[in-house]
Amino acid sequence: MKRPTKKLNFLNFLLEFCSHETAKVRETANQIVLQMQSSGDYRDIIEEYSVMYLRFLISPTPPALLFGEDRGRPIIQEIWTEDIVKVCLYLFLSLLPKNQKLFKHLVEVYSNSKAQVHVDFGLAQGGVKPITVQRTILRELVSAVGSIPIDSPELLELVETCPPGSEVLIMRIVQVLTDKVLPTPELVDKFRNLYKDRSQDVRLLIPVLNGMKKQEVIQGKYLS
């Protein structure tokens, strides 16, 4: 595996296995790919591949590329399921804590994903019900963003440039982080500006309330 061509072929197999139906296969391939990414080998290729899979979620139906005997899904499905959405997120969310510049791709996909996901909630809760791809993204990103520093420059930029339609995603990311640590003054300021520039919906401030001045909150400055 010293020759580049052989290593690239090996990497290609690994990347394909990162979306395999069998969890053990997927996890093993993902671990090796992350090691290769951390060492700097083919970092761009790995990240571009993860973004390609992430962008599948903009499509109204799952692409045929996700199916086949070699993927552990011999039958092509024409509707999104929660498991297939998770597979498309798997590698990308593993890379996100290592490179927060990938945030911009997550925001783009979240804002443009309109498809529904069919989720089996069990007979007691009504069986199979449709939810949005966006809701699945919000649920899956929790473990991925938890290790991101609260003072991440990319996080501050994300809040500052918050594209319309991505407010809930950004609120969720920051809420996960501020469950463990206080928001920085810079982050609080970014949310204040976001509140003023948008609909002045006070819910935008919820993730950073514990970083605001007590008097500011008591006076209800943002509740009028």
Language model segments and positions:
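Eukaryotic alpha-helical solenoid repeat scaffolds
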Residues: 1-224
